[in-house]
Amino acid sequence: MAQTSTNSHPSSSDDQLRTKLRNEALKERSEMAEPYRAHKSSVICQSLLESLDLTLGITGIAPEDACVAVYSAFPEEVQLNDFIEELYERGVRVAFPCMIKDSWSCNDVEQKMEMRAVDAVSYLGKHVPFLLHPLKSYLHESEELHAFPYICARDLTMIVVPVVAFDKHSNRLGYGGGNYDRYLTQISSDCRKIGVAFTEQQVDSIPAESHDIPLPILSI
């Protein structure tokens, strides 16, 4: 197995390797049969609930005072529906990613990710604009977002991160935008961080960059 390198200035060969590994993992994921993917997602959701229970037990935080950041899955990603619905059942506050652009920007290139709280009625009724259009970016003060309160990163109890590829050292690859890399630097050290993926997405070794934040990966 190749050694994992840590570079402050990644070489073009590392960039090419990361792209290659990302594409290979996405291909493996896309070839999974839907019933198989659904079963694995269900098992992962149960494990996430166990992790949440452990976190609440350690911190002493009551479910109604907890806030968990999740994501609205694309069809081939780990589906979190069972986990999310159980969070609502327990009275946990649930937050989802929303892409934000600066008011002076005329395009979606200059953007960042923040978390917004979504209530159960809006989630189940599919009335959330940034879940219906996850790639669209919004102004922070947009009227479309008024019903979904901003969540400070340091107030999160737990965050679940979608992972494209990972290795045994907990190095990971996302889709290449760096949104979670930037966001994870803002959260509290007490926040439980978990990346989720299928075992089919594991690769031998990912060349790490200095800004990368390794994540415990929950994979089935």
Protein language model annotation of sequence segments:
Residues 2-154:
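N-terminal active-site beta-alpha-beta segment that forms phosphate/nucleotide-binding
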Residues 103-220:
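Conserved phosphate- and dinucleotide-binding cores of soluble alpha/beta proteins
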